[in-house]
Amino acid sequence: MTDKRKDGSGKLLYCSFCGKSQHEVRKLIAGPSVYICDECVDLCNDIIREEIKEVAPHRERSALPTPHEIRRHLDDYVIGQEQAKKVLAVAVYNHYKRLRNGDSSNGIELGKSNILLIGPTGSGKTLLAETLARFLDVPFTMADATTLTEAGYVGEDVENIIQKLLQKCDYDVQKAQRGIVYIDEIDKISRKSDNPSITRDVSGEGVQQALLKLIEGTIAAVPPQGGRKHPQQEFLQVDTSKILFICGGAFAGLDKVIEQRTDTGRGIGFNATVKGSADKATEGELLSNVEPGDLIKFGLIPEFIGRLPVVATLRELSEEALIQILREPKNALTKQYQALFNLEGVELEFRDEALTAIAKKAMARKTGARGLRSIVEAALLDTMYDLPSLESVDKVVIDESVIAGQSEPLLIYGKHETQQASGE
């Protein structure tokens, strides 16, 4: 089609749909014996968009995965944490089922089930939230609770979280309202003491108060396209009651709070019960018994805990679990580096003892799965630096001594059928 103002005879042209002349519109597009103006094109686009919106909810309702399907998908990417995956699968399924049925069933209002994840660093809290959002194909954003402050103070306003979510979906409010927000380091905004303070705590209890309404459900007014707020502008209205909030934190020291509550038979003096190290519960076992009172004693306010009714605890990853993480998930770290080396036409092999050494090193650093990448990256750095300049390398082998820093990776050359260290 071409843009036409007049035909060859100089005759005045009109839109075949609305009847407006070429002088009344900005553009007139010509087809075979027919014309359409820019205004009619815009109208057609609006009609199509509205029809897509009406059809989408029915499509979504039929496509809602079951808890078993959600759990199976999490199993593909997250090793261990079986109970946490089951809790998450049920909570997420119920949340989106509530959205698809209009927040109520037979006149009964369905409550919102935000989630609190408790577990040590590198146990998979963030990965679980990211994997869920990717599987459900919903917008996802992360926020760090330590950067948040009350409105009016220097720092990040809690409403900026919603703005980040809108940015992820090009400011489509309907999409944003189906999204997932993960707030990390939530334990760092615990108040500094059990007793309410008369002084302001703008990064602790004050932030909990600011997050209350956002997490429970409110209409957040967000400036369009990330601009600053000013009285004359129109705001985007986002209903946060439809957004799933997942809060996560390590809660270091919470196990001691739980131990004090559960260890009722300690006694004093000659009546004290002496427990050996074998009798003591592990941190993971203690955290699995967490109750709202323990979180209040830790420093979260009761109102905030009430907005996070679903609690899932994650255990510290064992050496065996770390080895599985290196090898088994669909996007396992070893598979990622093997794909990277394949781009150079080189095969990368990790021997079993190398994976064990990587896991032991991560355990010693107490960084969980998060520390695995830095260990592998350090071991492969020199090889990745040299490899593009080397010819005829067919294979690179990583063993235990490479991870320990005692030798260089083994390079196997195709043409000469010799084995050399990359440093030679």
UniProtKB/Swiss-Prot annotation:
PANTHER family per the UniProt record, alphabetical: ATP-DEPENDENT CLP PROTEASE ATP-BINDING SUBUNIT CLPX-LIKE, MITOCHONDRIAL (PTHR48102:SF7), ATP-DEPENDENT CLP PROTEASE ATP-BINDING SUBUNIT CLPX-LIKE, MITOCHONDRIAL-RELATED (PTHR48102)
Quaternary state and interactors: Component of the ClpX-ClpP complex. Forms a hexameric ring that, in the presence of ATP, binds to fourteen ClpP subunits assembled into a disk-like structure with a central cavity, resembling the structure of eukaryotic proteasomes.
Organism (species): Pectobacterium carotovorum subsp. carotovorum (strain PC1)
Function in brief: ATP-dependent specificity component of the Clp protease. It directs the protease to specific substrates. Can perform chaperone functions in the absence of ClpP.
Gene: clpX
Gene3D superfamilies linked: 1.10.8.60, ClpX chaperone, C4-type zinc finger domain (6.20.220.10), P-loop containing nucleotide triphosphate hydrolases (3.40.50.300)
InterPro entries: AAA+_ATPase, ATP-dep_Clp_protease_ClpX, ATPase_AAA_core, Clp_ATPase_C, Clp_protease_ATP-bd_su_ClpX, ClpX_bact, P-loop_NTPase, Znf_CppX_C4
Family indicated by similarity: Belongs to the ClpX chaperone family.
Gene Ontology terms, MF aspect: ATP binding; ATP hydrolysis activity; ATP-dependent protein folding chaperone; protein dimerization activity; unfolded protein binding; zinc ion binding
GO biological process, one term: cell division
Binding residues for Zn(2+): C15, C18, C37, C40
Protein name per the record: ATP-dependent Clp protease ATP-binding subunit ClpX
